[in-house]
A protein has these predicted regions:
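Metal-dependent amide/peptide-bond hydrolase catalytic core
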Residues: 4, 197-282
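Conserved short loop/turn motifs at secondary-structure junctions
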Residues: 33, 124-128, 276-281
Length: 282
C-alpha cells in the first residue's frame, strides 16, 4: 500500500477519533456480558447504518450482526471482526470495548479511501466470545464463508501484527452423590463435593507433568449446601488451554481420566457439559 493511501486512511480515522473514543467509553460503562450485549450491539449497528453500511441484525446469535458496504465491483470480500462482551463481575477487563470502535474506524477509513478499488467490506459483530465462542456458532450457521480474508484487533499494551492464540476447552461437570446428615449418619453419604475437590487436587498434581504452555483452571459453581449435610450435588467448571490443539486433546483425555478416578474414589457419578472448543492458531 502506498504511503499516500496510508496517510489518507490515517486522516479519516483522525477525523472520527472523538466519536470512536466516546463510543468505546459508552460500551465500557455498559459492560454487557456474553449473550446480553443488546445495547452495545445497537450502538455499533446504528453507527454503521449512519455511515452507509447495510446492517443485518441477529446473524446466528441475538446480539450478532453483519454490516456490508461495496462499491459495485466484484473484488475481494474483506471481513472485519469485532467482539464486545464484558467479563462477568469485572467488566471490560479484556478490552472488548475497544474492538467495535476500532473495527468500525477501520471500515469507515477503507470505505472512504478505497472507493476506486474493487472490494466489498463486511463488518461482523461476534458476541459471546468469553463464553460460547460466538464466531464458532456463526461459522456453524453459515456466516463468514463469503470472506476472502478477515481482520480483527484486540486491546493490548503493545502493538503487534502477529499474536499467538491458545486452544481452549471448557467443561461444566455436575457430580452426583448421596445426601446424609454429616454428624449422625456420615457413613451413608457419598459426597459430590469430595469428588470435585479430588479432581482439583489431581489437576494440581498433573501440572508437573504437562508442557509449560498448558493452563488448567477450575472453580466451584455450586458447592452443595450447608456443612452439616453431605452434599449430593456439586457443580464445577474447568478450563484447559494450550498453544497446540493436538496437545490439548491429550490433556483433555487425561482430564477425563481424572473425573473417572474422582468419581470412583468417592462412590459418586458425574455428567459433563463440554462447550464448543477454541482451536489454536494455524
Amino acid at each position: 500500500m502506498s504511503d499516500d493511501i496510508k496517510k489518507q486512511l490515517g486522516a479519516v480515522i483522525d477525523s472520527y477519533k472523538e466519536d470512536l473514543c466516546q463510543m468505546a467509553d459508552e460500551i465500557f460503562d455498559l459492560a454487557e456480558i456474553s449473550g446480553e450485549e443488546y445495547k452495545t450491539s445497537d450502538i455499533l449497528c446504528s453507527y454503521l447504518e449512519k455511515e452507509g453500511f447495510v446492517v443485518e441484525r441477529g446473524t446466528g446469535l441475538e446480539t450478532a450482526f453483519r454490516a456490508t458496504w461495496d462499491n459495485g465491483s466484484d473484488g475481494p470480500v474483506i471481513g472485519i471482526l469485532v467482539e464486545y462482551d464484558a467479563l462477568e463481575k469485572i467488566g471490560h477487563a479484556c478490552g472488548h470495548h475497544l474492538q467495535g470502535p476500532a473495527g468500525i474506524g477501520a471500515a469507515i477509513a477503507v470505505k472512504n479511501c478505497l472507493q476506486d478499488y474493487p472490494c466489498r467490506l463486511v463488518v461482523y459483530g461476534t458476541p459471546a466470545e468469553e463464553t460460547l465462542g460466538g464466531k464458532i456458532i456463526m461459522l456453524d450457521k453459515g456466516y463468514m464463508k463469503e470472506l476472502d480474508l478477515a481482520f480483527m484487533s484486540h486491546g493490548s499494551p503493545n502493538t503487534s501484527v502477529d499474536e499467538k492464540c491458545m486452544a481452549l476447552e471448557n467443561f461444566v461437570v455436575t457430580f452426583h452423590g448421596v445426601k446424609s446428615h454429616a454428624a449422625i449418619s456420615p457413613e451413608e453419604g457419598r459426597s459430590a463435593l469430595d469428588a470435585a475437590l479430588l479432581s482439583f487436587h489431581a489437576i494440581e498434581m498433573l501440572r508437573e507433568h504437562v508442557k509449560d504452555d498448558t493452563r488448567m483452571h477450575y472453580t466451584i459453581r455450586n458447592a452443595g449446601g450447608p456443612p452439616n449435610v453431605v452434599p449430593d450435588l456439586t457443580v464445577a467448571e474447568y478450563t484447559l488451554r494450550s498453544y497446540s490443539t493436538k496437545y490439548l486433546d491429550e490433556v483433555v483425555e487425561r482430564f477425563y481420566n481424572i473425573l473417572k478416578g474422582a468419581a470412583l474414589m468417592t462412590g459418586t457419578t458425574y455428567e459433563v457439559q463440554r462447550d464448543l472448543p477454541f482451536k489454536s492458531k494455524v
